[in-house]
Each structure stands twice: as structure tokens, then as C-alpha cells.
Amino acid sequence: MLDIKRKQDHIEINLTKNVESGLSSGFESVQFVHNALPEINYSSIDTTTTFLNKILQAPILISSMTGGTPRARDINCRLAAAAQKAGIAMGLGSMRTLLTEPSTLDTFTVRNNAPDIVLLANIGAVQLNYGVTPKQCQYLVDSVKADALILHLNVLQELTQPEGDKNWENLLPKIKEVVNYLSVPVIIKEVGFGLSKKTAKQFIDIGVKILDVAGSGGTSWSQVEAYRATNSLQNRIASSFINWGIPTLDSLKMVREASKDISVIASGGLKSGIDGAKAIRMGADIFGLAGPFLKAADVSENLVSEEIQLIIEQLKITMMCTGSHTINNLKKAELRMNHIPLY
């Protein structure tokens, strides 16, 4: 029940409080060079891409947010239905609750709303140090018919929660066991503080093929925990990390330095399809957003669909104005960083 209460707190705080990182994602330092003569018909712009052996109509992921409560069930169902209509991917929030409270399954079950989407199950990697087994990880995947399992890394969040899990020792070998055991790929994801080149390499070396950088610039989970603090000391500790983390753009570059061959998701502080286009150009395969979708999904499926359409149109216009007919063309679009051309 404590886990369910925490999830309720997280939704309410994210919807009503300012929990943004004090750091920028870094994408404002990157600008596309405008192409005044693209020689393309806008109606022929192709935003499709392939991810986890499925075709996405746009390289967009509704990043993991919630689950485990009635409100979360409604949010997830609206997100999934909108993702199905748009042909984009979706991640579920942490499913640890399901292992202790089986009755929460319906808060994560969205396949009836979204039979065709790329769907990602999710649990905190540190739970492998607290008794969660590879077999249970497979159960999470099977229970929602997911295409992959996210193991999220939230060390700073855990350390700033009074009830947080603080033993992160010898975790990498356990993650490797899950990678080798599962019938689907494992995605390693930070939660808003970024992955370094060194950390990325550690996961690549044990067989992980997909990384979500989830850098700084968007939601800061230490700030969320500051609002949950039950005394002033806990609040002051959590609040002091507002400027912590690797900005998303920097993390994206670091992960790409670690490997050109893995799949990379860019998330963390992306505000628009323009930021998403920049992320694709800088090495991401797809890009994820959470905050804009959460607020919409708390109201209606139609608002989620409108938000998705906004991001897709921003992406398409960016592609048109850079002369990029396809996502592969966009990856080579002319770009300037801090007023210096990038090639």
C-alpha cells in the first residue's frame, strides 16, 4: 500500500507543482540551418521509422509515467488509445506494485486500447537487489504483452526518498541475468539525470542494445521527492539537487560516443517536435516526452491526441524546412551548434 500511496503522490505533485530541473536539456544550443527551397511536397514528408521490429508512424515515445492506482489506470488507457491512433510507442510506469498487489494489473493493462503499438513494461533496476527475479521480470512483460522491458535507474530519487532503496551494490551482474533470461529486449533508462559514456559502455558490454538517456532538463525526481518530504531536513536534502545531472543533449552525445550501433532513445526536457528533430539529428533513433502528455491524459484522450498531433506537425515542418524528406534525411540535416556548423 505504501507503493500505491507513493504513486498517488507522484501523479499529484507532477500535475500541480513545478518540478523541473534547474538545468536545461541543452537543445537550445542547437539550431537547424533553414532551407528556403526544400523542393519537397509537404504531403509526402515521411516520418515513419522502425523500432523493436514494428513500424512507428513517427519516432515518438510516450515516456513512462504511472500505474498502480485508479487515476493511473485512466491516464494509461487514454495514453494508449491515443498512441494507437497515432501509431507511436508508449512506456508504462513502474510495475513493481504488480508484484505485491496483483489487483493493480488493470491499471497497466492497455492492450485492449492499443493492440498494435510498441509497448514497454517497466520496473526499477534496483529492485533486483531486493528480491525481484528474472522470472518475475518476464511475468511483468507477459502480463501486459509488452515488446520490451525498461529497467530504470533512479539512484538519486531513491536516495532522496525516506523509504528509498539504497543498496545499489553488485547490480550490474543481476541486470545481465535479466538481459540473458528475457524473451524480449531490455531497455536501460535513466529517469532525468542522464547516462554517461562510461555507464553506457557498462551496459553495452553486458548485451544491452537499447538505452534511453533520460537526461536533465525536464522533470527532476529529486524535486518531486522534496515535495513528498515529511520534514524540513528531507526537503532541504532533496531540494539541493535541483541542478544535478547530465543535460539530455550532452548525455545523447556521450552515449553515441560509446556506440554507434545500439538503439538510442532521447528523453528528458524535450518540449516539442522541434527538440525531437534535433535529438534525431544528434543521434537518437526515437525521442520521448512525458510531462506534456501527463497533463493532457489527466483530462481526456482527445487532448492527448491533440498533443501528439502538435508534436508530429512540429516535426514535419522542421523536416520540410531542412529539406528532409525522411527520418534518415533528417539525421543528416545541416545544423549549427553554438553558431558553429556541424557536419
UniProtKB/Swiss-Prot annotation:
Sites where the protein binds FMN: S63, S64, M65, T66, S94, N122, K189, T219, G269, L270, K271, A290, G291
The UniProt record lists the keyword Magnesium: yes
InterPro entries associated with the record: Aldolase_TIM, FMN-dep_DH, IPdP_isomerase
Binding residues for substrate: R6, K7, S94, M95, R96, Q157
A GO biological-process term: isoprenoid biosynthetic process
Annotated GO CC locations: cytoplasm
Compartments it resides in: Cytoplasm
UniProt-listed Enzyme Commission number(s): 5.3.3.2
Molecular-function GO terms, alphabetical: FMN binding; isopentenyl-diphosphate delta-isomerase activity; magnesium ion binding; NADPH binding; oxidoreductase activity
Binding site for Mg(2+): E158
Assembly information from the UniProt record: Homooctamer. Dimer of tetramers.
Role: Involved in the biosynthesis of isoprenoids. Catalyzes the 1,3-allylic rearrangement of the homoallylic substrate isopentenyl (IPP) to its allylic isomer, dimethylallyl diphosphate (DMAPP).
Name of protein: Isopentenyl-diphosphate delta-isomerase
Lineage of the organism: Bacteria, Pseudomonadati, Pseudomonadota, Alphaproteobacteria, Rickettsiales
